[in-house]
Amino acid sequence: MAEQPAGQAGTTDNRDARGDREGRRRDSGRGSRERDGEKSNYLERVVAINRVSKVVKGGRRFSFTALVIVGDGNGMVGVGYGKAKEVPAAIAKGVEEARKSFFRVPLIGGTITHPVQGEAAAGVVLLRPASPGTGVIAGGAARAVLECAGVHDILAKSLGSDNAINVVHATVAALKLLQRPEEVAARRGLPIEDVAPAGMLKARRKSEALAASVLPDRTI
């Protein structure tokens, strides 16, 4: 068997290693694009980014925290709090935590079902349903939660602390207190017409009819 020169063998090995690196680079790029495609299905809002420090024996170690809201714009929303040495990593951790804490918000015609007040630490947020066309009347932190949840018409007011973290958690606490008219009617043993206003029921029937008319187009 003919022996291959040492120089030629080294060149072949270098080419193989270079090809492996290029293949891994292409695969990693494809994976990042796929992850970007997954993220595009959700609404993401970064409410606050803070730089924090930890005092250790050798001095101070700085890191960043990010408060992130993630929702599908159709009743699902979650809140995440990420911490890392770099801002993008902190946001990514916040997004991952927010997706793990998803919960469903009962909506009728783009607004909430009834007035509710949520409290978290020193934060107090009051939410009231609004008529179509009102819009989201809320501050920055509460607005991010409501928009990601898919609320289009609502009146919100902060009655406590102005801290963004407290306001966000108070808003989430208020949304988790919402109940559907069917639940209240079943608990009281009454028909739903005696529990929910006629305008609310009409708006729900209209939204259900609209969703039913759009659904066949999405399945094609």
From Swiss-Prot:
Recorded GO molecular functions are: rRNA binding; structural constituent of ribosome
Q: Which InterPro entries does the annotation name?
A: Ribosomal_Su5_D2-typ_SF, Ribosomal_uS5, Ribosomal_uS5_bac-type, Ribosomal_uS5_C, Ribosomal_uS5_N, Ribosomal_uS5_N_CS, Ribsml_uS5_D2-typ_fold_subgr
**Region (Disordered): which ranges?**
1-39
Pfam entry (one) = Ribosomal_S5_C
Q: Which residues form the S5 DRBM domain?
A: 42-105
| N-acetylalanine found at | 2
Q: Does the keyword Acetylation apply?
A: yes
Keyword Transport belongs to the record:
no
Q: Which GO terms describe its biological process?
A: translation
Gene Ontology cellular-component annotations? cytosol; cytosolic small ribosomal subunit; plasma membrane
Ranges of Basic and acidic residues compositional bias?
13-39
Q: Which keywords annotate this record? A: Acetylation, Ribonucleoprotein, Ribosomal protein, RNA-binding, rRNA-binding
- Report which superkingdom the organism of origin falls in: Bacteria
Q: What does this protein do?
A: With S4 and S12 plays an important role in translational accuracy.
UniProt similarity note: Belongs to the universal ribosomal protein uS5 family.
Tell me how this protein assembles.
Answer: Part of the 30S ribosomal subunit. Contacts proteins S4 and S8.
* Domain remark text: The N-terminal domain interacts with the head of the 30S subunit; the C-terminal domain interacts with the body and contacts protein S4. The interaction surface between S4 and S5 is involved in control of translational fidelity.
Protein name per Swiss-Prot or TrEMBL:
Small ribosomal subunit protein uS5
Organism (species): Mycobacterium tuberculosis (strain ATCC 25618 / H37Rv)
Q: Which gene is this protein's source?
A: rpsE
